[in-house]
Amino acid sequence: MCGRYVITKPVEKTVKIVKSSTTVKDDENFNAHPSQALPIIKSYSNGKTLELVKWGIVPSWAKQKDFRPLINARIETIDEKVSFKKLIKTTRCVAVMDGFYEWKRSKESKTPFYFTREDKKPLYVAGIFENNEFCLITEEASQNVMDVHHRQPVILDNNEIDNYLDLKKAVSYTHLTLPTT
């Protein structure tokens, strides 16, 4: 489960992708975590924007005080879950990050591992949103991540962002292999 990530210079990283990013500053966050307002790419009829949105969805049907925000959705079951099946068809987004953390557990401790691209280009992660909240979509881990954790975010290639955000198209993506760092 992806529960922490790093994002630096989000405006700079998306300048060629989005039309507007007026509400987002080029800050650095080395410990992005659920409940924070984080930059995501949304698509509108007049173009894509970079917006700050809270990580963690409390579904509209849930009673907020009784419901823990959902930070991840499994790609394998996203069409079946009440919390997500409408959102994947109507409100897709893309989170921007430098890399993400996963923790390897042993009997004695948890050790953090940081995953990023070897070329240091940003990761564009598939997500969904509702109102002003979003969650990341995860998949089974690639071989390099699997040694640490059994899940990883669904990472889109740059040329897959437009297709993913196009609600007329089915969700598809290329599985990117990340090194362990």
Language model region names:
Residues M1-L176:
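Short linear sequence motif anchored by a di-proline
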Residues T177-T181:
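A short, hydrophobic C-terminal helix/tail in secreted or cell-surface proteins
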